[in-house]
Amino acid sequence: RELFDGETLVVRIPTWPRKQGGAKNLILNYLVFVLAGMFCLPWALRGLKFDAILVYAPSPITQTIPAILLKWIKRAPLALWVQDLWPESLQATGFVRNQKALSAVGYMVYWIYKGCDLLLAQSKAFIAPLNDYANRSKIRYQPNSFPDQSTDALVDAPAPLLATLESKFCVVFAGNLGQVQALDCVVDAAELLKDHRDISIVLVGSGSKSEWLAQQKLERGLGNLELPGRFSMQTMPSIFNRAGALLVSLEDDPIFELTIPSKIQAYLAAGKPVLASLNGEGAQVVLEAKAGLASPAGDSAALAANILKIKAMAIEERAEMGRQGKSYFLEYFETESQARHLAETLSAMGKGTQ
């Protein structure tokens, strides 16, 4: 037990660590959390009353099962904030390929959704898939948010990175460097642009593709591909502020057309032009906000063309894209306003007036 911000009680339960990954550790992590939650939480929360229960649910969806038990014990309504679609995401990532297993997961998802009083969709495109497993009347749109960091204290990036950011037109990608980020497309775009010596693509972060990226940079002689590593959240604004544009990319898969990558909110908050190399809802947000340019997922030639196009724009034109994106962010994604909306939704659910 601990207090968050000195006033909010946080109760932690044991689970199996993921360690170095692998299917065995992942399955044990999922299973042990469910069992520990069902046995530990009712005891740890004994004597406490709740107006509502909220589950924030990136994978796995099974984390909702202990909350369903708590709902029955505490007689409090349960809201599930869906961040990832099951079984679709299991199939898209290749984690589960057997159709019978996917069907069984589908039945489990139906049961979990049935046990919830309210389903919150992080993307408008989630609503239709959720409706396949639950009644439309209990589905609401609740986007993810990001804090407005314009007044936060900044920490400068290391000098070598700052020198690159200030001497070239830099397209910055920030976040996990993994399989689903379609980094092969980004590397191919860098190769197409390597004769443009005043352009650099900067991939800030780390992940399962970090070693592969370093190898590709060396083998292809990509002096325009920068891999500076990870930095603290306090450092990111100084990097974003010096970027010519910010890049978000995802693989070409139907499941990813439904989601809005969380980095889009962060990019809009930064007030810089956004280059979206993806399909579906994420690209739609960038275009609707008039905050940047979009190209089809996996199309390296189109991405390279958009990089050249945005670089060729007048500085004021790029600045206007940034302003439009920031305005859209403040209206739809800013943390304080979205937190108020979520609190109002949960309050109404607790009073039975949702």
PLM regions with names:
Residues 117, 240-257, 272:
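Acidic donor-binding loop of glycosyltransferase active sites
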Residues 162-181, 187-191, 202:
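Conserved donor-binding/catalytic core segment of Leloir-type glycosyltransferases
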Residues 202-205, 211-238:
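Nucleotide-activated donor-binding/catalytic signature segment of Leloir-type glycosyltransferases, i.e.
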Residues 49, 62-65, 69-73, 77, ...:
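Membrane-proximal helix-turn-helix segments that form the acceptor-binding/catalytic region
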Residues 309, 316-331:
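A short, well-ordered alpha-helix in the C-terminal region of glycosyltransferases
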Residues 145-162, 182:
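Acidic anion/phosphate-binding donor-loop and adjacent secondary structure
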Residues 125, 142-145:
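Carbohydrate-associated surface elements
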